Amino acid sequence: LSRTINFDAFEPLVIAAKNAGVERFIYASSSSVYGGSEKTDVTESHPLVPLTLYNKYKGLCEPLLFKHETEDFVCTVIRPATLCGYAPRQRLDLTVNILTNWAINRRKITVFGGSQLRPNLHIQDMCDLYKQLLIEDGRKIRGQTFNVGYQNMSVMDIALLVKRVVQEETPGEADIRIEKCSSDDLRSYHINSDKIRKTIGFEPKY
């Protein structure tokens, strides 16, 4: 099912969009395509070493998109960090969101591992970037791949920040405890987003 949705259906979608007269295709890949890396800064040229099938197929779709690029069909790949922020249909499987949920509703945050680095990006910044890419000079973004990852923090540092903010926002409630457990999730990477900043001037606001 993962292959069917994330890989097999991708190229037919690109072809259908191109045949329908779509002029610009912005593909949301994932910064998780890098897997785990000990490099200080992971740039767009870093080898892709995905740790899951989902991220493997995300990476394999990138060259499929560029294969169909023409003068009238601008193709761009972005590799966003893990998103966070409020939504009407809240996702609670994302690092910042799930830790915040635990802090508010359990008054206890469970940290699995803790040393893993996880770049984050607010959902509103992601939406602002999509809007900017739709009107940006095509010559700047044609055939380009961009990291979009800021706030490179460890999972434990995120937990400590969530604890502080939630305690400040809920005075009088019980103190929030942090419980550390082992983890088999090895994803850890520090994303460098200098390229998109220098190319189109994108900076997160949230």
What are these regions (language model features)?
Residues 7-13, 22, 55-65:
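Conserved catalytic Lys-bearing alpha helix of Rossmann-like short-chain dehydrogenase/reductases
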Residues 36, 49-79, 104-105:
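Active-site Tyr-X1-5-Lys
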Residues 1-5:
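NAD(P)H-binding glycine-rich loop region in Rossmannoid oxidoreductase-like domains
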Residues 106-107, 111-206:
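C-terminal substrate-binding subdomain of Rossmann-fold SDR/epimerase-dehydratase oxidoreductases
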Residues 39, 50-57, 80, 88, ...:
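The catalytic Tyr-centered alpha-helix of NAD(P)H-dependent dehydrogenases
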Residues 11-53:
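Conserved Rossmann-fold NAD(P)-dependent oxidoreductase catalytic core, especially the SDR/UDP-sugar
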Residues 29-30, 79-80, 84:
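Conserved SDR Rossmann-fold cofactor-binding beta-strand/turn motif
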